[in-house]
Each structure stands twice: as C-alpha cells, then as structure tokens.
Amino acid sequence: MASCVVRDWQGKEAGKATLDLKVAKEASAVDLMHRAVLRQQAHMRQGTASTLTRSEVRGGGRKPYKQKGTGRARQGSVRTPLRPGGGIIFGPKPRSYNLAMNRKERRSALRTALMARIDDITVVKDFGTSLEAPKTREITEALGRLGIAADTKVLIVLTNPSEMVRRSVRNLDKVKLISANHLNVFDLLHANSLVVGEDALTTIQEVYGDD
C-alpha cells in the first residue's frame, strides 16, 4: 500500500489518499511492462505499406532484347527485379503487427507500472472544476503550484475530463490528458510527472484493486 498527499487546485495539502495494487514479481516486472509497451506500440502501426512484385508491376512480359549477340547479360522480362521499374523482391505487404498478451498480464503490467511511478504521482482534488473558460495559462499556473516545471512531460488522469480542461490542455505540447478508463502502460512510463484526480484514483483502485 502506498500513501499520497492530496492537494487542492491552489497546491495546498488537502488530505491523504492510498493506493493498494498487487504488482508483478520483481524478477518478471520489467519484462512484463516491456512486453506491454511493445504490444501497445505495435497496435499503433497501420501495417499498410505495400510494394509491387514482378507479377503486379505494370508492363508486359516481353523480352527486352534478344537472347544472344548483344554482349549483355540475358534478360527474360522487363518486369524482372533486376531492372529499374521492375518488381520488388520480398518487399512489404499489408499485414497486422498486433501482438497477443493475456488479459491478466496486461492488467498486471498496468498495476506494476502505476505503483512504480507512485513517487511521481500528485493527487489533486477537483482538478480544473473552477475553470470558467478554456485558459492554457490557468493549467500552466496550476501545475506550477504543484511543483511541476513548465518543461516537464506531464500525464493528467481524470475520471471525466470536462470540455474546459480538454481545451485548456490541448495547446500544451508537454501535457497529455487521458481519462481513467484509458489508462495505459506507455503513457504511465513516458511521462515525468503524473497528476491524478482524487476521484480518478478511487476509480483506478476500484477497477484494478480486486485482482
């Protein structure tokens, strides 16, 4: 079980919160998280790269020049891979890069990644609820009050991010906003600091704390 300080929108301490998740064994934790990240990155690939083989290249099957008497190497087709504009040998074809991973492994990897970043988590009560209009400066100042530098890669996790928060954050290159039900290993490990809403932390505990 890990304990976190809960802060309000002004950065002042507003209580305590706990997170108790079962993590993978130390011997297999790194490998488990690594496979989860590889799987997530592989699923981002479109797999639409395609080249033409000699049977698909435009052009007839005519012989470019006669078999003998030219002094050149013999050629049987203008579509051969040996000629410019010919087919491609062993080129890419559309395929799926998806990698399989058991559900229990995926959940264990996420829990392990989350607990590994527990020292970098800042729990905030009512994050952004006081915003009356979309203002990037308000988010930047709030992160500053939480002790997070402007050039830090930040992951903000909220249960249901409001439209005001979404529009205020989207102009910040170093800040990424996701909902608690879209939590993933890559984002958890990629960010330098994590800002988690108090209600989002409760949701995470409810969803992942039973295993």
UniProtKB/Swiss-Prot annotation:
Query: Has keyword Iron?
Result: no
Q: Where is the composition biased (Basic residues)?
A: 60-71
- Give GO cellular component annotations, separated by semicolons: ribonucleoprotein complex; ribosome
**Keyword Thylakoid recorded:** no
User: Which BP terms does GO give this entry?
Assistant: translation
- Region of interest (Disordered), ranges: 42-87
Query: Where does the source fall among the domains of life?
Result: Bacteria
In the record, what terms sit under GO molecular function? rRNA binding; structural constituent of ribosome
* Keyword line: Ribonucleoprotein, Ribosomal protein, RNA-binding, rRNA-binding
NCBIfam families given in the database record: rplD_bact (TIGR03953)
Q: Which PANTHER family match?
A: 50S RIBOSOMAL PROTEIN L4 (PTHR10746), LARGE RIBOSOMAL SUBUNIT PROTEIN UL4C (PTHR10746:SF17)
Family recorded in the similarity comment: Belongs to the universal ribosomal protein uL4 family.
Q: What does this protein do?
A: One of the primary rRNA binding proteins, this protein initially binds near the 5'-end of the 23S rRNA. It is important during the early stages of 50S assembly. It makes multiple contacts with different domains of the 23S rRNA in the assembled 50S subunit and ribosome. Forms part of the polypeptide exit tunnel.
What is the protein's quaternary organization? Part of the 50S ribosomal subunit.
Q: What is this protein called?
A: Large ribosomal subunit protein uL4
Q: Which gene encodes it?
A: rplD
